[in-house]
Amino acid sequence: MARRRQPTARQMRLGTELQRLREAAGLKGREAAAALGTDSARLSQIESGVVGMSENTVRRLAAAYSCSDSQLIDALVSMATDRTRGWWEKYQGLLPISFLDIAELEHHASHRFDVEFLHVPGLFQTENYARGLFSYRVPELPYTELELRVGHRMERKVVITGPAPIPYEALIHESALRIRVGNRSATQAQLTHILEHSEADHITTRVIPFDLDDFGGAWSAMAYAGGVVPKLDTALRDTAHGTASIDSEAQLAALRTLFRKVKTVSLDPKKSRDFIHRLAKEL
């Protein structure tokens, strides 16, 4: 198969998972390449996502690595053979690749959850709120790119508002609800928008109030996307150098535990809706 100039995060993740299976089997690159009937350079390209692969290649590698997890193997085959063109591809070359990657990640997710402290989660944002966030940067974005980013963010909502919505849970700190991105009416509209979403059966919204005692989780913001199998889960976290993608099993398990801890101290869904409703009236 032809080399890819810029593999997507999903394509690179497939290669990473195959590399992990190889390493777990204790095989060197040249040994795995020999089992596949190719060379080390080609295997390196497969593991970096630079070249694609067929179902047969994935299954031969899994067999060489003595992987007996049929669900994982089937999921990897699906990643390798999926040729669906997603809505986000129309933004190729117009927006940073990270925008396309998160849309593709969400498209294939089995469920999503967010923990946010400063801003309303992207899947809950109104158009005006998103425009306000993207406008507040230096140097300012050209108008065309600003509108492209807003449009992309609105289209991401399809995973919770479209014909096949996925389960979504949002833990939102009171600070994110109170910060005015825009004027008073825009903030009220944003809070109302959250309330409308929270009425859906597949969506759960919880508020983390200011008045919690002994709360040390303000650093726990994350976006989490469940894979077809837990080993293919992915978490995104903001760092000083940008957004970091996390996919190691140990780190993902730690983040799931952290999410449960924050969820435990959050208000329940009904109290959260009441809280947001009162806040909207106070503004």
Regions found by a protein language model. Name each.
Residues 2-16, 20, 24, 29-34, ...:
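Interdomain hinge/linker segments and adjacent boundary elements that couple functional modules
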Residues 164, 171, 181-283:
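C-terminal regulatory/effector modules of DNA-binding transcriptional regulators
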